[in-house]
């Protein structure tokens, strides 16, 4: 067998995926020999770490709907950790042929279960063994509230009614800690834990704010989508970006949900 020389610790330079993975690992019962299904595996945080911990007697399968993310993860792997594999698969519609695992993890994953998150989570549990553990993380309701409030204020100054309604809908669509606890209870999970921890994101003002790699992709783009007129969107968002002081600190809520599948489940 090929001797493993590389270590697969969580990358310290990642200011988003790693902090969320840390709260996931804080709830995960992890030991050698486990089989793990890691959903929304992206480029491998924390799939590589999980594979290193379960060792060659275990199995880790990372799935992601993005072919480019799967290709990136495979390129990083480069033949290491042969008991780890990455596959392109929509976690909302997994084939019945996919087996059940002892652990089901997903870092920054809950948002990708939409539009019917509860039904999608119920489907995930078909691939968790009885007595197995589910641990998922996501940025919960309340994440970057100061940003949404400032954008709403600026929209109000411009007299924008439809755009404000769309923004409110975007914000309300994000699940809360109470929401996900309710899902786990309805799914008859046991030893449920739902924990939120703050994460401060640092940014400059102006274009540094508007193009911030953590803020733009999953958050500010939602605000831009509220506008039919993108020139107006740019004008409003530029005004917001120049008022960074009123929004700081920029706080995300790292939410981790965990629960154990009963050996004998009761459908509710």
What residue ranges belong to the model's regions?
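Conserved alpha-helix/loop element of class I SAM-dependent methyltransferases that forms part
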Residues: 15-34, 49
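Class I SAM-dependent methyltransferase SAM/SAH-binding core
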Residues: 37-39, 43-94
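Helix-to-beta-strand junctions that scaffold the AdoMet/dcAdoMet cofactor pocket
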Residues: 55, 113-114, 128-129
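A short glycine-rich, Lys/Arg-flanked "PGG" loop and its adjoining helix->strand segment in the class I
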Residues: 118-133
